[in-house]
């Protein structure tokens, strides 16, 4: 039985990457050691992390005036690290179009009770259960603000921001955890990008931060571990980094480059997601909670049947047939097909075949 992993993260990894990691697991580069055993100060690991950064720069066309960091703590730590480094004494705007954007804003509000800055809710679609991307009134943005924070892909609700808001020069900061390397964004349009690795980059434990150099604070009053400048100047080696996760990320970057890069990956992702969206649209049994096609994610596709009982039956039968982790997030319900970069097109076709069969038997 073929297993298809629809998990929203940690998620499916490319089979060639896993196979290469397997062959190198006990003896990396004739060192007699596993990558997990390499000193982070060794030449072997120095080559790994430098190659990983170069590959990521090439894939995303990252300009030279941006620094790339491989950090720890997940994207959730960035909810605090970001305002601590960039926003002290200033305003910071937040667009809340999903659960993770809400958490980022809530963390900023919490921090503002002890750190002098003003988090402001610029736009939200919470009233309609995040079923769309809210309209953003750029006239409300103070030109002296520290940043405007967005989440480019809402993993739970299945919406995405593809067209960036006009911010009149105020840096856009993006949580890009679930669609980094899946669709093309112009890095120069952002002041800072951060992303947890466990969707499109590798195993959980690595967080990518890409920041424009002029935004690095000269004298932030905060812990060295939370200081972007210290981490950047140390080459992500201020303390022991997640070495094996960075190694897997490098292999994923190599795989993506060989595939044709981000532009080719976006074509593949739009085709995969389009197959499923088209089927849902043509069905009167399944429904997408995201009404506007322009807001729909290519990475995370939620859908429901006519009842919660049928949803539960669908998940149970799908799981038995090898469609794993397709249950929707507990806050939304229904089902969610996470079609990250490594998810195969055949898995989408097989899912649609099952959906047709389930509909015929339960309509």
Swiss-Prot record:
L-glutamate binds at residue 41. Pathway: Amino-acid biosynthesis; L-serine biosynthesis; L-serine from 3-phospho-D-glycerate: step 2/3. Gene3D superfamilies: Aspartate Aminotransferase, domain 1, Type I PLP-dependent aspartate aminotransferase-like (Major domain). Its cofactor is pyridoxal 5'-phosphate. It is found in: Cytoplasm. Its EC number is 2.6.1.52. SUPFAM superfamilies: PLP-dependent transferases. InterPro entries: Aminotrans_V_dom, Aminotrans_V_PyrdxlP_BS, Pser_aminoTfrase, PyrdxlP-dep_Trfase, PyrdxlP-dep_Trfase_major, PyrdxlP-dep_Trfase_small. PANTHER family: PHOSPHOSERINE AMINOTRANSFERASE. HAMAP family: SerC_aminotrans_5. Belongs to the class-V pyridoxal-phosphate-dependent aminotransferase family. SerC subfamily. This is Phosphoserine aminotransferase. It comes from Streptococcus mutans serotype c (strain ATCC 700610 / UA159). The gene is serC.
């Amino acid at each position: 039985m073929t297993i298809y992993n629809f998990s929203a993260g940690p998620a499916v990894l490319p089979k060639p990457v896993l196979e290469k990691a397997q062959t190198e697991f006990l003896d990396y580069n004739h060192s007699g050691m596993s990558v997990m055993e390499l000193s982070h100060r060794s030449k072997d690991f120095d080559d790994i992390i430098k190659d990983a950064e170069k590959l990521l720069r090439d894939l995303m066309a990252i300009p030279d005036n941006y620094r790339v960091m491989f950090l720890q703590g997940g994207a959730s730590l960035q909810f605090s690290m970001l305002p601590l480094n960039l926003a002290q004494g200033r305003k910071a705007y937040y667009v809340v179009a999903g659960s993770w954007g809400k958490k980022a804003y809530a963390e900023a509000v919490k921090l503002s009770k002890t750190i002098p800055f003003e988090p402001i809710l610029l736009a939200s679609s919470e009233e309609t259960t995040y079923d769309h991307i809210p309209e953003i009134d750029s006239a409300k943005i103070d030109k002296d603000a520290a940043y405007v924070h967005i989440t480019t892909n809402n993993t739970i609700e299945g919406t995405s921001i593809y067209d960036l808001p006009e911010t009149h020069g105020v840096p856009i900061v993006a949580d890009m955890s679930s669609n980094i390397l899946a669709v093309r964004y112009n890095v120069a349009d952002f002041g800072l990008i951060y992303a947890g690795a466990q969707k499109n980059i590798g195993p959980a434990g690595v967080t990518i931060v890409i920041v424009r150099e002029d935004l690095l604070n000269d004298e932030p009053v905060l812990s060295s571990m939370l200081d972007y400048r210290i981490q950047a100047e140390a080459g992500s080696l201020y303390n022991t980094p997640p070495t094996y996760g960075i190694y897997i990320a490098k292999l994923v970057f190599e795989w993506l480059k060989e595939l044709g890069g981000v532009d080719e990956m976006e074509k593949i992702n739009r085709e995969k997601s389009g197959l499923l969206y088209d089927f849902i649209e043509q069905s009167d049994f399944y429904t997408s909670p995201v009404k506007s096609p322009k807001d729909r994610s290519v990475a995370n596709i939620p859908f429901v049947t006519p009842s919660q009982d049928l949803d539960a039956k669908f998940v149970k039968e799908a799981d038995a047939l090898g469609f794993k982790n397709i249950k929707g997030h507990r806050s939304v319900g229904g089902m969610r097909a996470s079609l990250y970069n490594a998810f195969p097109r055949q898995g989408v076709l097989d899912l649609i075949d099952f959906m047709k069969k389930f509909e015929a038997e339960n309509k």
